[in-house]
Amino acid sequence: MSATVVDAVNAAPLSGSKEMSLEEPKKMTREDWRKKKELEEQRKLGNAPAEVDEEGKDINPHIPQYISSVPWYIDPSKRPTLKHQRPQPEKQKQFSSSGEWYKRGVKENSIITKYRKGACENCGAMTHKKKDCFERPRRVGAKFTGTNIAPDEHVQPQLMFDYDGKRDRWNGYNPEEHMKIVEEYAKVDLAKRTLKAQKLQEELASGKLVEQANSPKHQWGEEEPNSQTEKDHNSEDEDEDKYADDIDMPGQNFDSKRRITVRNLRIREDIAKYLRNLDPNSAYYDPKTRAMRENPYANAGKNPDEVSYAGDNFVRYTGDTISMAQTQLFAWEAYDRGSEVHLQADPTKLELLYKSFKVKKEDFKEQQKESILEKYGGQEHLDAPPAELLLAQTEDYVEYSRHGTVIKGQERAVACSKYEEDVKIHNHTHIWGSYWKEGRWGYKCCHSFFKYSYCTGEAGKEIVNSEECIINDITGDESVKKPQTLMELHQEKLKEEKKKKKKKKKKHRKSSSDSDDEEKKHEKLKKALNAEEARLLHVKETMQIDERKRPYNSIYETREPTEEEMEAYRMKRQRPDDPMASFLGQ
């Protein structure tokens, strides 16, 4: 069978350019091998022309043979080529061009008057089926009526972009959209010019420009500072400055003085740190960190509170910097006294130790103060009122009106909250909401539950309490039972007897179950004691054997000991500290 296959392959016609010889490859002679190697050397040196592939491209002679040799399954003709090393066209992905993009604003101009085969049975569009239709389900579909057929939706193309195409920020941008912005700016400029021309015409009609031109100082190039025309112009310029921001468009700055438009101008009025004092001997500026710790105005004689910038040193003393320094100082002092604490190694331990130290320090000061006062006295001098009240005069000037309000001076008022809740109205001494009872809010001073009521004081409290007593008496009278009939009394008696019988049965069951449980516990404890005695005996025998001859014994058990086993262990355990243990052993 193999011979017939070989004959059939040999008999097959071969094309001229792609002749495939299935004959056995002939072995190269020594002379042919030598000539081939010499030709390769000449090509590498550039003395012989390089090999050319089927596309007319030169093959680099320095490429190794394992790269340049063609596999038999790609090209059996064994022609010189590097096509197998290049990207294969059938495996290359097809990407969309940079000009392609999704279509926007596609109008549905096509009108369909007849149902088409394969369209949606509900609306008649060709782009989807009935189960994917978003239109409201019709009672009779477009397939059967043939009327009101919906137009086909525009199917957006599936765009596949390469690496650069995905990151192209201008892909899909229409340059014609920018013309709308240009037209808007042109309209604003035209409106400004129209307003300016209209103002000039009004001034010319009123004669202001003629008067200004005919003035003698204007002819000599001088201006009248106090003239009415200049005042009018100044007022107009002020109005233009006032409303210039309303006329501005984003990205431009309108200067009303120069009548020009400056676009994209960023005005920075802040001063750099290194420009505040140009003296080279002033505060040092570090360009790497952009920091200037010292005050640049230190040598200028200015007060640091008056200048806008006084250096970056204030940042070093803000936040927890001071407390951190105090904690570090405490750690050093504690380490000198033998305490092993460190700010970086044990920060939590140091913080707790420092807090306890501060508490003890305050307590020690208080105790020292109390002991001194107790020993020498003088507590009454510490409780004395301030010197202003003792002397009954102050240097604070206060001027009052006839109504009692302060006109000048400082008023020593009671510190109250800024909120409205602390406002006391209608002679109340407590605020609304200071008293609560039975789900209602009121005033604590009179127990009134009405917000805008007047305060009645203790009398109001007594009235509220008396009303509560009357209400309780009424409810107590209502709760008195009505007289019962003989039938109702008999039924209640039967119910009570049934309840008593049930209680007796339950008690009997409980007593019997308790006795059974005690017997079971006693038996379990007896078994546990026997097992514990056997274990102790086994341990005693094992300890008498030589250590090298003892058998393997594992103390590990997977189960947890029961309560009876623990009780037996406690009862049999030897206590050498007990003075009566020796008597019990005898």
From Swiss-Prot:
It is found in: Nucleus; Nucleus speckle; Cytoplasm. Residues 235-248 have a biased composition (Acidic residues). The modification Phosphoserine is found at residues 215, 227, 235. Keywords: Acetylation, Cytoplasm, Isopeptide bond, Metal-binding, mRNA processing, mRNA splicing, Nucleus, Phosphoprotein, Spliceosome, Ubl conjugation, Zinc, Zinc-finger. Residues 20-44, 529-550, 557-578 have a biased composition (Basic and acidic residues). Residues 498-510 have a biased composition (Basic residues). Pfam families: Slu7 (PF11708). GO terms for cellular component: cytoplasm; nuclear speck; nucleus; spliceosomal complex. Belongs to the SLU7 family. Required for pre-mRNA splicing as component of the spliceosome. Participates in the second catalytic step of pre-mRNA splicing, when the free hydroxyl group of exon I attacks the 3'-splice site to generate spliced mRNA and the excised lariat intron. Required for holding exon 1 properly in the spliceosome and for correct AG identification when more than one possible AG exists in 3'-splicing site region. May be involved in the activation of proximal AG. Probably also involved in alternative splicing regulation. This is Pre-mRNA-splicing factor SLU7. It comes from Macaca fascicularis.
